[in-house]
From Swiss-Prot:
This is Serine/threonine-protein kinase TIO. ARM repeats lie at residues 1056-1098, 1101-1140, 1143-1182, 1183-1223, 1226-1273, 1281-1320. The active site is at D127. GO terms for biological process: cytokinesis by cell plate formation; embryo sac cellularization; male meiosis cytokinesis. Interacts with Kinesin-12 members KIN12A/PAKRP1 and KIN12B/PAKRP1L. Interacts with KIN7B/NACK2. It holds the Pfam family Pkinase. The lineage of its organism: Eukaryota, Viridiplantae, Streptophyta, Embryophyta, Tracheophyta. Keywords: ATP-binding, Cytoplasm, Cytoskeleton, Kinase, Nucleotide-binding, Repeat, Serine/threonine-protein kinase, Transferase. SUPFAM superfamilies: ARM repeat, Protein kinase-like (PK-like). Changing N132A: Alters binding to Kinesin-12 members.
Amino acid sequence: MGVEDYHVIELVGEGSFGRVYKGRRKYTGQTVAMKFIMKQGKTDKDIHSLRQEIEILRKLKHENIIEMLDSFENAREFCVVTEFAQGELFEILEDDKCLPEEQVQAIAKQLVKALDYLHSNRIIHRDMKPQNILIGAGSVVKLCDFGFARAMSTNTVVLRSIKGTPLYMAPELVKEQPYDRTVDLWSLGVILYELYVGQPPFYTNSVYALIRHIVKDPVKYPDEMSTYFESFLKGLLNKEPHSRLTWPALREHPFVKETQEEVEAREIHTAVVDNKAAWMLKGNGGQQRNEKCDSVTLVEDMSATKGLADVQSDMKSAVKVNSPPTEDFVGFPTQEEIKSSGNPTLDKLENTSRTVKGAQVIGENDKALDLVLLSLERFSKSPDSKRDKDVACSVQSLRIISNLVATRAIVSVGLIEKITCALLDFTDALVGMKSPEFNNIIPKSLSVTKNLVGHVEGNNIHSSYIRHWTKVVEIFIQVVRWEEEGTGRIIYEACSCITTMLSRVAQDLKSSTPDSVSKQILEHANMSRIVDHLCLCLASSGSSLTSGSSQMLAAACEACRAIWILIDTSETFFKNDDVNILPLDALQNRLSQHDIGNSEWGPLSEKLVDTVTRAYLRSKHVQVAVGHCLHQRVEAPLVSAIQLLSRCCLHNGILPSMLCGLPSSLPITTVVSGGEDGTVISEIFSILSYATLSSKDQQTGEKDNFEGRLNNLVFHSCLMLATVAQCLKLTGRNSVLLMLTTSPKKHQHRLSAIANHIASDDKIEASLQNHSASAMLALASILALEKGSSAGSSVSELVVSLIPRATKLCYHLRPMPSNEGEVISHSANYAKWHGLLDGCIGLLESRLKWGGPLAVQQLIASGTPLLLINLLAGKLSNASPEDIKKTSNRIGLSPIGVVWTISSICHCLSGGTTFRQVLVKIETMKLITCLLSDAHIKLVKSWGGPGGGKDGVRETINVIIDLLAFPFVALQSQPGSLSATASVNSGFILNIGSPGVRVCMEDRDLLKAIEEDMDKYIIVLLEVGVPSLILRCLDHLELKDLVRPVAFLAKMVGRPRLAVDLVSKGLLDPNRMKKLLNQSSPREVILDILMIISDLSRMDKAFYKYIGEASVLQPLKEYLTHVDPNIRAKACSALGNMCRHNGYFYSALAEHQIIGLLIDRCADPDKRTQKFACFAIGNAAYHNDTLYEELRRSITQLANVLTTAEEDKTKANAAGALSNLVRNSNKLCEDIVSKGALQTLLRLVADCSTLALNPSKKETASESPLKIALFSLAKMCSNHQICRQFVKSSELFPVIARLKQSPEANIAHYASVIVAKVSGES
């Protein structure tokens, strides 16, 4: 016998093994299950194992084991025919959740008998689970699916290969220890426990947690469980295999031992079944004759219709061809299983449509089809009250059409359109009646419609497609709001029609000549707000799933698919299918934004994404539905859900945090444990673990195809992890704990789950595979959340071991020559918003960051810096804009990849020769600074993916500034430099974490080289136009993002040549200064701008004119009273230096009433502010006496500083200021004396005199304020008699006379001058 001896009725299941159909043995009424297993892709070992399974099954004859009736194979496939059992025990669990103990006991008795039979025949099932237990007629339990079964020889004791379902696996299996037949007994215990309780004894979504529970945790038994039942389960669920209940004691246990009545009933049932089977076999001959006879007289006359003779002739010829038929298909149930409509013509048409040839005959005859459609049209047009009598005929017509569609018997476009219209009208009429009796018909009609609208000849979408679309949308909008039990299948099929049609539209829009109908459909989708209704479908599905029902699960999956296809198609439409050219590629090939098309999303797409994002954020039910789509491990909905969530993350900055389970009100700088179990991020990591385990266990003939599907899951899962991590990073969140939780074990598991999908170091692929590239990207993106190699983080112990070796990473970064010697592009078709090399370069940057100085030196020695420079240069052949569009992502670096590349180069600067190779070479600097050009910045800003937009522009500019600032940081950080010892210095923010800081501590030779080449470097900066580039960058950034650019300006201002260039290029433009000195500016920006003003003022009086024109005095005045003491101090310092060289600003200071505020700062509680205020007062009095009257009030404040200040420099500034107050006139001399300032100066001299006369080796008198105090007294006594008289009469005058003997020359000199002036000596 062969497959030709069976009718194939319908598909009942499928999996990696193949497909299972419901069938019927010809000429009998025997219903069978037919399992088809393809040989393609299977090894000889696999085929041998399949034959072994068949042989095992063939020998088994038991009432509780599915019986194999037949088997055969050809060159392409195996077919195993078994008895047909109606449902799975799994379905009972889904519907009823749990069963009463009496029913569980009845099932247990049958399963025990089945296992007793198997084990007595030395066969281990090895995959006991509810899905492999079927329920046949009379509630007879049938054990099936022996794909993992293994026959043991008489010498076999234990086996070691691991198979089975984790939930039902015994402890010895999960521990990969030897096992025997008792593993089946453990699985039996788990199944019975689940039937009674509602879930297995150990249940969790995490494979690792599940294994831990199975091995270590005790089983908890419900209190209401009977003693016998609990005793039986304890005997089975014993973690020690040798202590489990086994044969023969098992079959004699009171819980499963059969009573005499049960034995007798079983024997009677077996006899009846055997007799029925024999009767069916004996009836073959007669049944065959009847079937042939019926086929010959297939169609009777229909008096009211013309043209049937032609149909009848065709039918008869079809019968001749089909005796016996050699090809069957999946359609509606057989004629024996359905109720006839009473229309003989339709009966015979349906009978003929059941064979492929017969269906083709009907499909080629328009008149026959008109007969079939007539009842559908009549039903659609009749009033509701008259439709009841048309139902049977309409349903029969539907079955006929289903058969025709299943065999693709209808090829005419016109007929397809006609049938589709009729079906949609019929379905719409059924939906409008809102009658539960049609709940089984509507989904069947929609299913057939879906097949029709999905089958469009060629690439053309006909004008009628828009009519079909609008009707499908109308139907979907009606049914999606149905909440009655049993409507889940209807909503699913309606949603599936939407998905199918959108998929066809997407395909059309990607063609070279898209049809206008496709665009009309997108416009209608927008106007009808179909995405809102799809979100409603998700919400309804989530509500149903939350209540414990799974009827809406398929609808949720299909809604996810439909939403994503709609969004993706809208973006394709907006871009007119322009390839997303990466900004770096466009820059290197001199393409403008116009040349590369629009790299943003588009208004319709943004609107759709916004709708979905809002629905997800607001509705817990929508979140539940999408979560179930992820959890199903079915490729299409899972990938759609991942892409949808990834896209929403790019649209809304809240969503990435939400997917990690972070509190919505969490401050950016606060670090908490994210990615805990139950979050979406946790589920994504579980998918990666699932893919790893599945790829190891996969042994079927479809291995290549299965591996491809797993790689696709890995690809999209890793891209989502990367997107979430990058979004968190771009919003300022910096910690891997946000995604990996605070558990070190989870750090290990999750990072390893990603790393497992990166090819091992000993296997370097000729080209980087997409899933491997995305795994690299995910790992790099997560590691980038850590700012530095913190020893306290468990990640630091994992990072270096997980990152591939540098040789492998660098291999993929090298140009790939083609056969003709030209360099070919990286990643022509990788991902829409990522570069193929992003992950590779990101891991290289992580290795440099985490690997320490040794890693840096090794990579430098291997030529990595030059490799990175060449990568940025895009060492590719010149290409036209058209060629670039054909091969997108030529260099393979997205904006984030570019940032990581620059960062990697920056890390290499601390390793010796790289500084001269990169920063002192003008060609290299031109290449790097080109990334700061308006052209590139605009390209990055318009980039729609991660690393684009305003955040991407900020990151791009900042990383290049870090690179350019390296020499400045290195020199400022060396011991003894002013900036190294200052608490707040110019551009200090750039010093934090910079490799330049390490240079002064680790490499004195490099520091010396930088000092030698600094002048050359400054020349290069000027030649490539860095000062003007940085100034233009300020215009591209938001105020909050100006910290690092302004810090770099502050560092450059410290070099005179750069300062001159900056000022000439508009650094001090009034509008710019107004913006930067605004109260809303970041604190660091304000401090650095104040420092810039101060440094320029101190450097050269030529800058006074530009500073004056910059209108900075008003903000300086305001900052004198700022709450931040550092800002007050910087403001005082700037004002002091603005008065350093001359009195240019004196009148302006008076006009803005600044002097009074400066005097108040002399009493500031902040030491630095007090010091710089005294300095500013002194300079305000130095050049002339214009401000003396305003400064009169400062005398008392300065005198107080001399007695209360803690820092000697502050006292020195106060003493110098007092001297300047009498330098230009005697206006303030009397106040100096009367207010005690002169006496305070004398007291200061007296207090410091002891040290001056006897200086120690560690501390000299020149470091005290004594010198300035003596200098001030000398000036006062030289010019003003009142001062001389006061000093001469003071009891402290002898102290000054003694200081003439000081070993410090200046002190002795000033003391001598004072004594001489006071004593009247020349």
